[in-house]
Amino acid sequence: FILSGAGLSAESGIPTFRDANGLWRKYDPKELASIGSLERHTQDVFDFYNERIKNAEPCRPNAAHIAIAEFQKDVAAFCDVIHVTQNVDNLNELAGSPRVFHLHGDFQTSLCRKCKKTFPRIGFYQREQVCPVCGANNFAVRPNVVLFGEVPHGMDWIPLYLKKASVFISVGTSGTVYPAADFVRETKASLRINLDLDPLIHPYSKFNHRVFGKCTETLPP
């Protein structure tokens, strides 16, 4: 079981949320990334995510993304590897990862607030955008990302995989965002590895192997 976070994509140019220069230092998440704000200040939320999407588009996978993808391919014949990422970019897919699940949604798909269907994103978000499934508009089409106040994706089946996993690897995540922060405590894996940049963010008491440094330095062979 691989869990990845913002630190994995930071070296590709996508800003993290909680470091010294992170997004939450510039914006109040309660204002721009919550379900309540989507209802009350829809255009502001759309502008925020349009900017994030625009900034992410030129970014490319780094050596750590590629290392994870190659690892998944190398062990696929004899080991079932599930990669759950907290990132909303598609750099893991671009690197060739055969199996990636986005816990917090992704930038590549949109969600209709009326019919609840998801579909490939087309351009940037605006009031006039029409849902290709039901035809709704007037801010009906929103980013398919998990906002504060919403339940992360996959929580109906992820706990089952955590209990079955023999190895748990955490890559580039601060371990402060729930429910993902609890995954290392929920897993039955005998080997629990943490690969992260800052060892001082929180105590890694449940990990039994730790490697501190940039993902591009700690992951590639």
Q: Where are these predicted regions, by residue range?
A:
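Conserved catalytic core of sirtuin-type NAD+-dependent deacylases
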Residues: 1-221
